[in-house]
Amino acid sequence: MLKKAVNLALLLAVASTAVSAEELTGTLKKIKDTGVVTIGFRDSSLPFSYLDENQKPVGYAVDICLKVVDELKEKLQVPSLQTKFNPVTSASRIPLIANGTVDMECGSTFNTVERQNQVAFANTYFLTANRFVSKKSSNLNTIADLAGQTVVSTSGTANIQELSMTNVARKLGIKIVAANDHAEAFLMLDTGRASAFVMDDILLASLVAGSRNPSDYSISSEAFSAPQPYAIMIRRGDQQFKGFVNEAT
């Protein structure tokens, strides 16, 4: 009788292990099988995702993702789980998530209805509004003041799309220039090649604070729209991983 009970317990243990293994799908299974989790980061999205003086990815969003990694090590029972950092841009971040190159994008990405057709998002971790920064000497205070001006924004962002729609809707005649990244856009403003830079207000504030002469700049009080949510971006349709990230954060 005792022998039968022991055998039954062993069978149940094996079955339980097998079921647990089968239950891992999508991103969790990929991470478990490869022993690597890949984090997408931005190199100049202060204070959320950027490179420090040692060229190490840091920031608030990166910290959130590293917390997820710690939880992954425990859940998957892989204490030696490796973390690979993969740089992304505004233009490349969605394709790299969608094609599986990156497991989590930890930058400064809006969770929008349009983007939900391609990717998914975890819990909101910050709210920010789309505004513009300009030099105080330009005396640009409202969106209407941008009429006829050269205005830069970053390629592949919701910000430049919103700027374009506002330009058309309000017939402002703005010349819109797309920069490769936030640093390039701010440099265009700093060197006079653009009159204003449209971006998330928190990112603009960080760029101004880190500039040579912060007092030279002014961020508009008027926003292009209501505040929108930042969230960690993950693959679409992977409810298991989404639930895990939400629980971990």
What do the PLM-derived regions correspond to, one by one?
Residues 2-11:
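Sec-dependent signal peptide recognition
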Residues 21-105:
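Extracytoplasmic small-molecule ligand-binding "clamshell" domains
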Residues 11-19:
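Hydrophobic h-region of N-terminal signal peptides that target proteins for export
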Residues 66-82, 159-178, 208-213:
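Ligand-binding cleft/hinge of the Venus flytrap
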Residues 22, 63-71, 137, 144, ...:
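Extended ligand-binding regions for polar small-molecule ligands
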Residues 43, 126-134, 201-202, 209-249:
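Periplasmic-binding protein-like
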Residues 66, 77-145, 218-223:
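Acidic, polar ligand-binding/catalytic clefts
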Residues 92, 106-117, 161-169, 187-226:
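A ligand-binding cleft/hinge motif common to bilobed small-molecule-binding domains
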